[in-house]
């Protein structure tokens, strides 16, 4: 399996941001790490191995990036306003730096699929829902899609525009909403076992239903924990469905 790493100083984030790409061809998959982890987390925990068949057969080219969660939502020393400012800067980093790199390698019209587990599911879903004109869809695993609990009741525009549970409820425009209503690749999946919060996925699904946005909500069994062994089953399962479309 081809594996390429690169890094550059992000003008949006003010720090070096490494990236790893797996594969020689295929549909681009942008991967957001869990919690405060780094761009190699999915390799260390064998999630990349779980989708190796798709990569080696030229169906998927996977791009894994760093998160900024340790500077934003998970930084208990930071003011909530700074936490969400970092999320907005991260969004600009994706759109202005990562997406052009992917399109340079996969074609100028490429619309990547996003994915992530746990806190990575929030980032993957948020990126897609904010930019459905530039991304194809999302496979969000074991996520929670309301950031308000991290912010000590703080509120500003950055909170609103980085919180899918907020902005999707009020989406009523003639640009983004029609595109989302044509979606064919939104997957919201979670287990119902230890440390999972299936009600968070159901909440997001209810919002999407209220807006007429097609999606797949799947609640795996009560034995399915918030853990790697299950994400290694979920991602190849839904990538298989995506590649058959």
Language-model-derived ranges and their functions:
Residues 1-245:
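Non-catalytic cap/lid and distal C-terminal segments of serine-dependent acyl enzymes
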């Amino acid at each position: 399996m081809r594996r390429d790493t690169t890094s550059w100083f992000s003008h949006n984030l003010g720090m070096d941001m490494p990236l790893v790409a797996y594969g020689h061809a295929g549909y681009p998959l942008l991967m957001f790490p869990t919690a405060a982890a780094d761009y190699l987390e999915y390799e260390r925990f064998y999630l990349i191995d779980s989708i190796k068949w798709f990569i080696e057969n030229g169906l998927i080219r996977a791009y894994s990036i760093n998160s900024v969660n340790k500077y934003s939502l998970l930084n208990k020393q930071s003011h909530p306003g700074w936490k969400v400012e970092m999320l907005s800067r991260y969004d600009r980093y994706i759109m202005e730096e990562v997406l052009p790199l992917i399109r340079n390698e996969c074609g100028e019209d490429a619309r990547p699929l996003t994915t992530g587990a746990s806190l990575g599911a929030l980032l993957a879903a948020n990126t897609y829902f904010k930019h459905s004109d530039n991304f194809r869809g999302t496979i969000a695993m074991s996520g929670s899609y309301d950031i308000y609990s991290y912010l000590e009741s703080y509120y500003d525009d950055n909170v609103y525009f980085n919180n899918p549970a907020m902005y999707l409820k009020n989406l009523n425009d003639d640009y983004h909403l029609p595109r989302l209503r044509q979606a064919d690749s939104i997957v919201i999946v979670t287990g119902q076992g230890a440390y999972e919060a299936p009600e968070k996925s159901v909440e997001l699904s209810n919002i999407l239903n209220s807006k007429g946005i097609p999606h797949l909500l799947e609640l795996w069994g009560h034995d399915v924990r918030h853990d790697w062994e299950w994400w290694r089953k979920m991602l190849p399962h839904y990538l298989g469905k995506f590649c058959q479309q």
